[in-house]
């Protein structure tokens, strides 16, 4: 089970030819007060996986018959939750959501070092156990002209 409605994450699963179901966890992805970026992505990956588990449990409960209720919660799933943030100069960069914000963010990243933190959580619904990792990688942006930024944004439209 993929605990995400992200087209990007679904594309990865599709490229891997995985047989999966995508469930939108529909959680609040806001950072907590003074929460470090690493802690944020780890918390969100686990929260997404657990939210998907709750959705699956509710679905099983709703579709099971009275006779079958005792087995409704015995199905087991492996749920993948993930999150990613970018960090520039120690500050978390949020999703731009529109062209103007994306342009400002790329202009700010131009010529700078940007660290991307990606979390991955594998949650086992049968045992309630999980494995979680956060992987950082750093990208050194070359200086970008406004025209280069515009061309990229018009082609890719990376707003979500």
Locate each region found by the language model.
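Cofactor-binding loop segments of dinucleotide-utilizing enzymes, especially the Rossmann-like FAD-
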Residues: 5, 25, 125
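N-terminal beta1-alpha1 ligand-phosphate binding loop
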Residues: 1-18
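A short acidic, helix-capping loop that chelates divalent metal ions and anchors anionic groups
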Residues: 29-33, 88-90
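Accessory recognition modules or surfaces
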Residues: 2, 33-34, 40
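Anionic-ligand binding patches
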Residues: 14, 38-60, 64-160
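A short beta-strand-loop structural module common to alpha/beta enzyme folds
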Residues: 21-30
